[in-house]
């Protein structure tokens, strides 16, 4: 049995510690190992408690962690087991105790309390925030009213919120009053009162409207572009959902008009031209009723019926939230349903967000593409390639991008055909006969061009009725197979051909590293997974300010890194020049460097 005596080797190690003025974890680990290695396995049956008086300041958790590493690495498993189970209990007590003197008066400089490597220092040196005065000057009255809080301070407070992922403005106001680095960034002394959260909230709800936020967002992008950090040759576009501040159980069903497509007029013109080329009557967009009574009786269509039909065609039923009516019901799979907004975002190769458009969560990515694309192309005409996933592989988007002289790089899009039927590629289009050849080598002739822009090719029902593979082709009662082809399908085939080229295939692989990383950082580091705001305008301003903060953060880090790299380059180049001068003087004294 263990007699409870402490080995002399341990006292010698402790004495060595007392003579030293520094106490590192390596020294503690070596001391504990000296003590533990002198014990025997008989300590399993007893409980050893050692008190050591060390006049040093050190965290107990670090000591225990060090002891655990020592026992697990340098001793046998049995000793580690004894320590973990509490058979050996090592307690280190400190003689020196800190007396809490909270009323001590000191003279300090807030500049000295903020580390030189702090992110806010990098941001402060990266841009000149005085530019904000030009954006908000017309929003303030200069000759009457109470003195206002500096608008730069208000924008900096919101910038702090998005940089550090603080969810509410109330929490931002509390953090600013407590955090010394935040006070330094805003220009407040330690004992100076900071703005109330209600002031911050009121200004960003009623004064700094959407136009002001857009100016801030574009100003930061201009600063980044002027320094040469933007590379908009390839732009990556995608959308991400943001959970709305709305209860998914509080909802109503409502009939809303179907939103007209932006390219509806252009599409209708080409549809009518295609119908006329095939000898069909063009569509009349106004759908005027027949004028004569004989025509009304012949068509069995009255004026009231046409109005009712027109009304029914342009209305649809949607699920609306009673809490936030401007949000949309986002459906993903069979079970995931929630009210959300969607941020359709575009970024360039370095990860800077160059454009964003916020829509309700039930708006498809391809519908919001035009707004994002037009915004990016207007600011950066040098864009050459648009990289997007298969959701953007639609005839209109392909036509729009290729007609502008740019390239659309997309992925494979799964055909939306019935499982078990003939695959789509077995229906071959014959351009000479303007017909489709089915797997049974029968021709499907042109029938019409519908209002959605699709040419319809129909089979002969007498042939299909006796076809042995009809069950793999169609289940229609009249035995007619219909194959549709969009009038802009050639642009989709061009995008499919580009997908197989090595250059654009490698470029598409970067999509997950660029735009997906932007979304991951925004949600994990900057609290964009859930919005506390309600209403499309408020959420859009919130998203744009968040992306502006992310751009500014990335820009400040890049600029600080380049500054340090230039400093190191100057040091090494000077040292190399001096060394080369000394060497050349020894080899050829007559050669000197100026």
Residue map of PLM features:
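Basic, short loop/linker segments at the boundary and entry of helix-turn-helix/winged-helix-like folds
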Residues: 116-159, 164-165
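Short, positively charged and aromatic/hydrophobic N-terminal segments
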Residues: 2, 34, 47, 70, ...
């Amino acid at each position: 049995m263990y007699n409870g005596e402490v080995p002399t080797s341990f006292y010698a190690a402790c004495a060595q510690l007392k003579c030293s003025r520094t106490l590192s974890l390596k020294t503690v680990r070596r001391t504990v190992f000296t003590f533990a290695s002198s014990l025997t396995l008989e300590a399993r049956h007893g409980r050893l408690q050692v008190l050591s008086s060390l006049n040093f300041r050190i965290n107990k958790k670090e000591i225990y962690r060090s002891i655990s590493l020592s026992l697990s690495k340098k001793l046998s498993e049995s000793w580690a087991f004894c320590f973990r189970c509490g058979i050996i209990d090592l307690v280190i007590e400190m003689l020196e105790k800190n007396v809490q003197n909270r009323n001590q008066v000191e003279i300090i400089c807030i500049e000295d309390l903020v580390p030189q490597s702090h992110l806010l220092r990098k941001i402060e040196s990266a841009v000149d925030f005085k530019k904000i005065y030009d954006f908000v000057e017309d929003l303030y009255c200069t000759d009457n009213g109470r003195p206002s809080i500096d608008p730069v301070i208000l924008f900096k407070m919101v910038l702090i919120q998005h940089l550090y992922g603080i969810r509410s403005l109330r929490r931002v106001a509390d953090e600013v009053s407590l955090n010394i680095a935040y006070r330094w960034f805003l220009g407040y002394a330690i004992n100076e009162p900071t703005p109330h959260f209600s002031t911050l909230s009121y200004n960003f709800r009623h004064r700094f409207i959407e136009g002001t936020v857009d100016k801030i967002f574009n100003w930061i992008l201009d600063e980044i572009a002027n320094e040469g950090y933007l590379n908009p040759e390839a732009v990556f576009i995608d959308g991400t959902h943001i959970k709305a501040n709305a209860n998914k159980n509080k909802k109503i069903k409502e009939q809303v008009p179907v939103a007209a497509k932006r390219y509806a007029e252009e599409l209708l013109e080409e549809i009518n031209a295609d119908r006329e080329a095939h000898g069909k009557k063009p569509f009349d967009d106004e759908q005027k009723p027949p004028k004569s009574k004989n025509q009304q009786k012949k068509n069995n269509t009255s004026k009231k019926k046409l109005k009712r039909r027109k009304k029914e065609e342009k209305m649809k039923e949607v699920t609306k939230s009673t809490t936030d009516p401007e949000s949309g019901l986002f459906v993903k799979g069979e079970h995931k349903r929630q009210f959300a907004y969607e941020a359709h975002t575009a970024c360039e190769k370095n990860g800077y967000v160059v454009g964003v458009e916020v829509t309700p969560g039930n708006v498809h990515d391809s519908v919001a593409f035009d707004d994002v694309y037009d915004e990016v192309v207007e600011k950066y005409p040098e864009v050459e390639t648009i990289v997007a996933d298969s959701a953007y592989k639609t005839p209109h988007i392909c036509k729009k991008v290729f007609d502008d002289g740019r390239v659309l790089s997309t992925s494979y899009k799964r055909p939306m055909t019935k499982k078990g039927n003939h695959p789509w590629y077995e229906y071959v289009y014959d351009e000479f006969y303007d017909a489709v050849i089915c797997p049974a080598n029968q021709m499907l002739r042109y029938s019409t061009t519908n209002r959605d822009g699709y040419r319809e090719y129909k089979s002969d029902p007498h042939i299909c009725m006796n076809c042995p593979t009809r069950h793999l082709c169609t289940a229609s009662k009249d035995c007619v197979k219909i194959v549709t082809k969009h009038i802009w399908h050639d642009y989709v085939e061009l995008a499919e051909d580009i997908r197989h080229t090595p250059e654009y295939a490698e470029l598409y692989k970067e999509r997950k590293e660029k735009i997906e990383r932007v979304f991951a950082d925004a949600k994990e580091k900057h609290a964009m997974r859930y919005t506390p705001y309600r209403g499309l305008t408020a959420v859009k301003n919130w998203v744009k300010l968040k992306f502006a903060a992310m751009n500014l953060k990335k820009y400040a880090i890049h600029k600080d890194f380049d500054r340090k790299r230039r400093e190191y380059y100057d040091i090494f180049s000077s040292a190399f020049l001096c060394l080369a001068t000394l060497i050349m003087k020894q080899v050829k004294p007559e050669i000197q460097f100026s």
